[in-house]
């Protein structure tokens, strides 16, 4: 039996060559180094075939073109030179494609990303479908890399410098119509006529006219001076976002500029060189580990039980969390939702919240007016339990009050089916206590979302001791359909994310009360790689929420969670954070600035004494210590889950790979030494936990 191949070539009676891509035993087409020999065979066949009029490259997969290069092959590289050789191999193959003497058309249906788009860019024309899953982009930067098979050179020459920089530096993915508008593709058509339209492009011949440039593009990148300005501005803007933590962005700018100034061949040469270096960088290795972890997690259900089908969801509470949960259920999971609130106003607020989010998508032409109406028809609500006897999963998002949540359990058990799952979105109450009076405790589980629900990618799934395996697997499957990455955590105070966040926030308060200025404190953690500083985070979450959660953690987990007494002082002065217009900062619209009167209120005289690095480490080390305790206490199932939880739940710097990967990189022995040094200076709260001491002493790592 002959071995299945990823590429097959046929020439039809019209002398059009059809190159079909179908990677065997894989759901998605990805490009692999092992395919190089196949491609060489294809080129040899093409050379031997006379009279070919043109070639169309298409996929035999039902819903994807090429999702990118197979990232796994980078893990086999032990040196930058090996990775550079991979890039060069890709460049050479695509150059051969580009050099064919007849027109080549890429017929794209579904994702066309990374190496897939680089393949398409090497063709003369690109035609794509208007299918919802058709996406085009070069997302390599999100793995700490740059496009290594000609993407940095071909895209700017096709669509111009300004839009190319935006696409390559962000890794954003374009929908089909936007790709057509930018000139990435030449046509966007229904999938039923994709191949017919591709054939029409063969008749246009090999030499395609250059894309017409906008006046702005001509002015900004048409001259050496304009280009210099563009690159300076792009570097400045990018550095403001990355704060120097992502070397790939610097390399991208350098390689594109080099190619435009020195020519295509030299541009490709530097592209391959920088690609090789980036593959071996700690930042890319960390970002790739996140990619592998999330890919693994997509295949897991939390237990071995099969998830039950979820055809309708109920949401209790029409507040911010309830509205967000209902939105991801309808928009992403495509499951209808019934919202129950104590007042009609609450239901209307949730419906209005959803309408505004869908309307934003309509304005961006992601949804049509008919799509918007269809989505809104999937949402209904009321003040009673009408139709709750048809609901499979109820997600409770009411006020954080134990009696109220227990009452919700009783109401659902009285009004829903016996197998209906009750998932509580509590952030601080133990799940076993919410389930204490339940008739069917096996149906009760924690499902902790993060705010704003439609943006935050993590959800914590918290079974209590008698939660059934089917309940766990069903809510894990639902969370994934909602576009979330779920981690299963143990039912203990703070669960995982809030438990590791608390010591970090407490330490920020200690530093503030030692007179460090607020902007210095926040800036140090931004430079470390967090998306927002700890003081800003407290304002965003709400000082009142912090005041509620901290005492619970102290009560359940001990004095190490006791922070400085600042909450009452702030709340008595009406400072709840952004939602009340002032906290540590004052807020006017989207603008915020440090409220200088806070220093007087807290009897402080701001004066910068600590280095940025010391501030960052003082906040981060207690978080790392607590993460190890969570692993050893069984709160999280693995270092992998702990890393993903911290990155997706609180924005731990992705380029560090998460708390556990960062500790391995830091060195556990060195980490223990640093903690002991801080413990002698600032107190026992820095003393390394037993798990850290043991691992450091035995020379072990987490991975």
UniProtKB/Swiss-Prot annotation:
GO terms for biological process, alphabetical: fatty acid beta-oxidation
Gene3D superfamilies referenced in this protein's UniProt entry, alphabetically: 1.10.1040.50, 2-enoyl-CoA Hydratase, Chain A, domain 1 (3.90.226.10), NAD(P)-binding Rossmann-like Domain (3.40.50.720)
Residues under site feature: Important for catalytic activity: 118, 140
Region listing for 3-hydroxyacyl-CoA dehydrogenase, in residue ranges: 308-703
Subcellular location: Cytoplasm
Gene Ontology MF terms: 3-hydroxybutyryl-CoA epimerase activity; enoyl-CoA hydratase activity; long-chain-3-hydroxyacyl-CoA dehydrogenase activity; NAD+ binding
Keyword Hydrolase: no
InterPro entries listed in its UniProt record: 3-OHacyl-CoA_DH_CS, 3-OHacyl-CoA_DH_NAD-bd, 3HC_DH_C, 6-PGluconate_DH-like_C_sf, ClpP/crotonase-like_dom_sf, Enoyl-CoA_hyd/isom_CS, Enoyl-CoA_hydra/iso, FA_oxidation_alpha_subunit
Pathway: Lipid metabolism; fatty acid beta-oxidation
Region Enoyl-CoA hydratase: start-end pairs: 1-190
Acyltransferase among keywords: no
Source taxon at top rank: Bacteria
Gene Ontology cellular component terms for the protein in this record: cytoplasm
Catalytic activity: a (3S)-3-hydroxyacyl-CoA = a (2E)-enoyl-CoA + H2O; a 4-saturated-(3S)-3-hydroxyacyl-CoA = a (3E)-enoyl-CoA + H2O; a (3S)-3-hydroxyacyl-CoA + NAD(+) = a 3-oxoacyl-CoA + NADH + H(+); (3S)-3-hydroxybutanoyl-CoA = (3R)-3-hydroxybutanoyl-CoA
Keywords in alphabetical order: Cytoplasm, Fatty acid metabolism, Isomerase, Lipid degradation, Lipid metabolism, Lyase, Multifunctional enzyme, NAD, Oxidoreductase
EC number: 4.2.1.17, 5.1.2.3, 1.1.1.35
Family: In the N-terminal section; belongs to the enoyl-CoA hydratase/isomerase family. In the central section; belongs to the 3-hydroxyacyl-CoA dehydrogenase family.
PANTHER family: TRIFUNCTIONAL ENZYME SUBUNIT ALPHA, TRIFUNCTIONAL ENZYME SUBUNIT ALPHA, MITOCHONDRIAL
Subunit-structure text: Heterotetramer of two alpha chains (FadJ) and two beta chains (FadI).
NCBIfam families in the record: FadJ, PRK11154.1
Biological function: Catalyzes the formation of a hydroxyacyl-CoA by addition of water on enoyl-CoA. Also exhibits 3-hydroxyacyl-CoA epimerase and 3-hydroxyacyl-CoA dehydrogenase activities.
Name of the featured protein: Fatty acid oxidation complex subunit alpha
